[in-house]
Amino acid sequence: MSDPVFFSSVGPILLAEVAALAGAALPEGLDRELAIRGAAPLESAGPDDLAYMDNAKYAEALGLTRARACLVSPRFAARVPEGTIALVTPQPYRGFAKVLARLFPSAARPTSLFGATGVSPGSFVHPAARLEPGVVVDPGVVIGPGAEIGAETVLAAGAVIGPGTRIGRGCAVGPGASVLHALIGNRVIIHGGARIGQDGFGFAMGAGGHLKVPQVGRVIIQDDVEIGANTTIDRGASRDTIIGEGTKIDNLVQIAHNVVIGRHCVIVAQVGISGSTTLEDYVVLGGQVGVVGHLRIGMGAQIAGSSNINKDVPPGARWGGTPAKPVREWFREMTTLKRIAARERLAEDTAE
């Protein structure tokens, strides 16, 4: 359940609107004035709340819920208890997300920590920077010369926007984030502590010492990208580091110089992608995946968590392990190792 200290609901919202947002049908004869005021999990939802259910593991909780209404897939509709209104939709979780965004708009992206509007007198905006109407700038923000900030963008306390950096419209930059040498599209969310556009890790190694290679590329982030807290994206060495439209990046991810990430990829926490690697569209990297440099991961490929990628991955492949390989091969290897280990333990026990 949401804590009103942190997230205030804009409810009530009529169930008719909930159904429209979620792509659900209202039951026939339902009172058109019925509404919800909040949203909560099945087990804690009350008579003013909306819940959702799309996993058989929660069938028992569904049967006991006290929610006013519940978004469910057709297979679970008959299990909704009396007193709770079943809103049947093919995608309950996606529908629930849309309703949450309507109920709690301030939770959808970083906002001003002070509920402020306009430019705070405690910020520093260089006279040569250009801000479109509706930009919110919190105390402690620094905006360098030549930077451009699009309309309705929010820069939270302590954010640093470097010289010449361009940020599109409807974006949000969280507390303490820095954005340098970068071109940012529209509706991009950058969470607190993220670092974008700093030096890539480039050195000409040699016995006489490691000579730093100047990094003169940029970071380009396309529309509707989300970047998690404390994620780092290095600028390119001599070409650009690029994050494609709609890609979602979790917290604590490292993306090295010259990496190109396609559209609508998903990159989970603690992934490290080495320099000059390319991810095509719709790639998914599970948590703690490591990717060697100068590789290509094909469109739609999925990599299991904690895997290490040391060669190109074909489009649509599902790989896992260290070094990573097709999951069926990986599973066979693990099963074989388990059997060998069991035989060895049996032999040792027999010898004793």
Swiss-Prot record:
One of its GO terms (molecular function) is N-acyltransferase activity. It catalyses: a UDP-3-O-[(3R)-3-hydroxyacyl]-alpha-D-glucosamine + a (3R)-hydroxyacyl-[ACP] = a UDP-2-N,3-O-bis[(3R)-3-hydroxyacyl]-alpha-D-glucosamine + holo-[ACP] + H(+). PROSITE patterns: HEXAPEP_TRANSFERASES. Keywords: Acyltransferase, Lipid A biosynthesis, Lipid biosynthesis, Lipid metabolism, Repeat, Transferase. Pfam families: Hexapep, LpxD. The active site is at H257 (proton acceptor). GO terms for biological process: lipid A biosynthetic process. GO terms for cellular component: membrane. Pathway: Bacterial outer membrane biogenesis; LPS lipid A biosynthesis. Its EC number is 2.3.1.191. It is an enzyme of class 2 (transferase). The keyword Repeat applies. Belongs to the transferase hexapeptide repeat family. LpxD subfamily. Catalyzes the N-acylation of UDP-3-O-acylglucosamine using 3-hydroxyacyl-ACP as the acyl donor. Is involved in the biosynthesis of lipid A, a phosphorylated glycolipid that anchors the lipopolysaccharide to the outer membrane of the cell. Homotrimer. This is UDP-3-O-acylglucosamine N-acyltransferase. It comes from Methylobacterium nodulans (strain LMG 21967 / CNCM I-2342 / ORS 2060). The gene is lpxD.
